[in-house]
């Protein structure tokens, strides 16, 4: 006759099989963002196991199917803080680098390893220090950072009890007064113990002793709260220290925080607790307190007491680990991973912003770990010119993560522009064309809503061009001055040489990084202007005007149609723009930034080689100038020091601008000889002419002497 048959014959209800409510994973959205950020910025290709904290709490007011939630909150990877009312579960996560690695992972071995951690802690007693391991979990995941898809699978490792445990009687509940006293004592216990102890504890009813004192306090029965005993709460480890000594068996309780709201079914953590009870406590019967009460509703009894007994006779302690199960089932009830698409829950603007950062951060994983991406991201870039060069430069800057881009241009979009200038469309040309600068800024925002782009319509004052409206010219100058001061980098991308003169002067005076690109039919030059010397003594690199012995003048006067348009091979602008932005990036990776020296050439003159300076530079060399020739598809790296008599960056010019501001500019625009004289170029020209005259005179004298000599020989 079976045990159940014997019980029935004796008129006793047979023991009931225990059924447990498994945990249901619940990942909050901030956790995904935290995991993605950790993968990009910290873990990179390291897919080692990381600790993670889970939280659960009594959920008696929820429907049973929704009550046993294991919550993974935003700070689960970085914080061990446990909010009031929650219970801690110690878990781990392994985020694989590829979906193939995720699929190939040995799920059985991973589960056994997680179970072994619990089993070993039970055997050696360390479980008493970290009872939260009894509700531990493991997560396998793969985060597709490009598509914002998260594949994951939770395991809640559970040790099987052999023989199994069964109900040994009807469940019991406490009265409202008993529950209130219990909740108060549990709160005191939690206040005095580590959060890892909060989920599992011992409880006992201590009868009032004869006499007037209860725990050292006078008894007061007049308040109606006398329940005939006091609650005493202890940690699991106190069992082996005699916590229940002298306490009647029916007043001894082994408790765990039960998140289940099922009427008679406890939640998952009890299964591991029962293994501990048999292995460490050597018990075959136990009163299990499924603690479901909360401080806020402590007068509403919700906890239940399950009297449990082992189905079979006691087995001797064993070192062999029991069977382990625990993989979470898919909502379809199958044992398989879950997939969530985060894109539908996220702000598209934020997705675009993170996607840009993703492409850049991936470069740091294997190729260039020392790359300083923040140096580019934080830049404020001013683009003088919103045409062909401005369009391509801005797109390349966004590719490097630059968020602040400002355009300055005085022109409108014409019908010839859209095919060469990718920020404009056919509709922008209608009705005389829209202003380029604001339209270019608008186009950037459509490409990446996270970029802070703006456009200003103003005319840059130019040498050699008459001042027709002094008030307007001064207003344009002051606006340009404000913009240059407010930005870190100034790009000179205009059509004419003379339009680059004033921004060169202003950029040098304000200590800004000035980048310059100019195009020919099949040639181009990209360069960085030399920065102002730190101490005013050392030499610096030259600017766009340092090779000139004349000041800029009106280059647009008397131009034919082919001279009025930028006549260049269509690919030249894209090549030059990309190279200019890459040069800026290399500058910012150098420890001296804009003060970085030009690279030194080694090897034969016809085939020079350039070494990284410093050797660990993240991107390579930092050229001063690159001149490209599309006819033979060659580039030349050139460097040159600043010219003491330069019309734009020499000390007299920059000093006059700093001291006089607009008055200097007005005089330079109205007096064609002012810049020549101030810079010293006029004197250089006079000396050159004097030398030329002297050379001409010497040549005439030599010819005359030769003729006389010839005559004498005859």
Curated annotation (Swiss-Prot):
Region (Disordered): 591-616, 691-714
Primary location class: cytoplasm
Alphabetical list of InterPro entries matching this protein: Atg7, Atg7_N, Atg7_N_1, Atg7_N_2, ThiF/MoeB/HesA, ThiF_NAD_FAD-bd, Ubiquitin-activating_enz
An annotated GO BP: cellular response to nitrogen starvation
Keyword set includes Ion transport: no
Cellular component GO terms, alphabetical: phagophore assembly site
Keywords per UniProt: Autophagy, Cytoplasm, Protein transport, Transport, Ubl conjugation pathway
Pfam families given in the database record: ATG7_N (PF16420), ThiF (PF00899)
Cellular compartments annotated: Cytoplasm; Preautophagosomal structure
Protein role: E1-like activating enzyme involved in the 2 ubiquitin-like systems required for cytoplasm to vacuole transport (Cvt) and autophagy. Activates ATG12 for its conjugation with ATG5 and ATG8 for its conjugation with phosphatidylethanolamine. Both systems are needed for the ATG8 association to Cvt vesicles and autophagosomes membranes. Autophagy is essential for maintenance of amino acid levels and protein synthesis under nitrogen starvation.
Similarity-based family: Belongs to the ATG7 family.
Subunit structure: Homodimer.
Protein name per its UniProtKB record: Ubiquitin-like modifier-activating enzyme ATG7
Organism for this UniProt entry: Pyricularia oryzae (strain 70-15 / ATCC MYA-4617 / FGSC 8958) (Rice blast fungus)
Lineage: Eukaryota, Fungi, Dikarya, Ascomycota, Pezizomycotina
């Amino acid at each position: 006759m079976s045990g159940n048959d014997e019980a029935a014959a004796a008129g006793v209800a047979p023991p009931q099989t225990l059924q447990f409510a498994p945990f249901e994973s619940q990942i909050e959205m901030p956790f995904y963002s935290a995991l993605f950020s950790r993968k990009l910025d910290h873990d990179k290709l390291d897919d080692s196991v990381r600790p993670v904290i889970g939280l659960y709490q009594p959920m008696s007011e929820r429907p049973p199917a929704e009550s046993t939630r294991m919550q993974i909150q935003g700070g689960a990877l970085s914080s061990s803080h446990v909010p009031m009312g929650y219970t801690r579960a110690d878990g781990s996560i392994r985020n694989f680098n590829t979906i193939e690695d995720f699929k190939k992972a040995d799920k059985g071995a991973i589960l056994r390893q997680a179970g072994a951690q619990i089993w070993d802690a039970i055997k050696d007693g360390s479980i008493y220090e970290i009872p939260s391991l009894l509700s531990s979990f493991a997560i396998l995941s793969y985060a597709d950072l490009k598509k914002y898809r998260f594949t994951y699978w939770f395991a809640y490792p559970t040790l099987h009890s052999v023989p199994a445990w069964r109900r040994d009687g009807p469940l019991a509940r406490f009265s409202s007064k008993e529950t209130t006293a219990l909740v108060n004592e549990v709160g005191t216990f939690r206040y005095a113990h580590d959060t890892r102890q909060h989920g599992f504890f011992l409880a006992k009813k201590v009868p009032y002793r004869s006499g007037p004192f209860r725990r050292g306090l006078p008894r007061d029965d007049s308040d109606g709260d006398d329940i005939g005993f006091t609650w005493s709460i202890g940690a699991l480890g106190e069992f082996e220290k005699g916590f229940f000594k002298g306490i009647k068996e029916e007043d001894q309780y082994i408790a765990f925080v039960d998140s289940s709201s099922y009427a008679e079914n406890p939640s998952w953590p009890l299964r591991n607790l029962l293994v501990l009870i048999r292995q460490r406590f050597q018990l075959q019967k136990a009163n299990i307190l499924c603690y479901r009460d909360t401080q806020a509703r402590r007068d509403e009894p919700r906890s239940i007491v399950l009297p449990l007994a082992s189905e079979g006779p006691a087995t001797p302690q064993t070192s062999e680990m029991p069977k382990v199960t625990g993989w979470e089932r898919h909502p379809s009830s199958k044992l398989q991973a879950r997939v969530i698409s985060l894109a539908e829950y996220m702000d598209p603007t934020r997705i675009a912003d993170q996607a840009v950062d993703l492409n850049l951060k991936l470069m740091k994983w294997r190729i260039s770990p020392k790359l300083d991406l923040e140096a580019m991201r934080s830049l404020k870039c001013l683009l003088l010119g919103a045409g062909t060069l401005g369009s391509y430069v801005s797109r390349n800057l966004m590719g490097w993560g630059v968020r602040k881009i400002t355009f300055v241009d005085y022109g409108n979009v014409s019908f010839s522009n859209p095919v060469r200038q990718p920020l404009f469309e056919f509709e922008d040309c209608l009705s005389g064309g829209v202003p380029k600068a604001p339209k270019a800024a608008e186009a950037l925002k459509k490409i990446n809503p996270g970029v802070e782009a703006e456009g200003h319509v103003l005319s840059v004052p130019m040498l050699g061009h008459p001042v027709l409206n002094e008030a307007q010219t001064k207003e344009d100058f002051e606006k340009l001055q404000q913009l240059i001061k407010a930005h870190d980098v100034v790009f000179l991308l205009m059509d004419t040489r003379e339009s680059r003169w004033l921004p060169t002067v202003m950029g040098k005076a304000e200590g800004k990084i000035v980048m310059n690109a100019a195009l020919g039919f099949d040639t181009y030059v990209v360069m960085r202007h030399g920065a102002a010397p730190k101490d005013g003594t050392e030499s610096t690199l030259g600017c766009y005007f340092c090779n000139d012995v004349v000041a800029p003048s009106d280059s647009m006067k008397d131009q034919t149609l082919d001279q009025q348009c930028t006549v260049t091979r269509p690919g030249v602008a894209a090549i030059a723009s990309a190279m200019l932005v890459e040069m800026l990036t290399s500058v910012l990776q150098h420890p001296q930034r804009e003060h970085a020296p030009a690279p030194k050439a080694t090897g034969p003159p016809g085939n020079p080689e350039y070494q990284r300076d410093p050797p660990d530079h993240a991107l390579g060399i930092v050229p001063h100038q690159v001149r490209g020739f599309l006819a033979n598809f060659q580039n030349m790296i050139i460097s040159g020091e600043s010219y003491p008599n330069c019309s734009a960056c020499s000390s007299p010019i920059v000093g006059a601008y700093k001291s006089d501001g607009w008055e200097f500019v007005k005089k330079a625009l109205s007096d064609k000889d002012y810049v020549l004289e101030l810079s010293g170029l006029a004197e250089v020209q006079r000396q050159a002419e004097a030398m030329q005259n002297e050379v001409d005179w010497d040549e005439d004298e030599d010819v005359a002497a030769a003729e006389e000599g010839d005559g004498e020989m005859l």
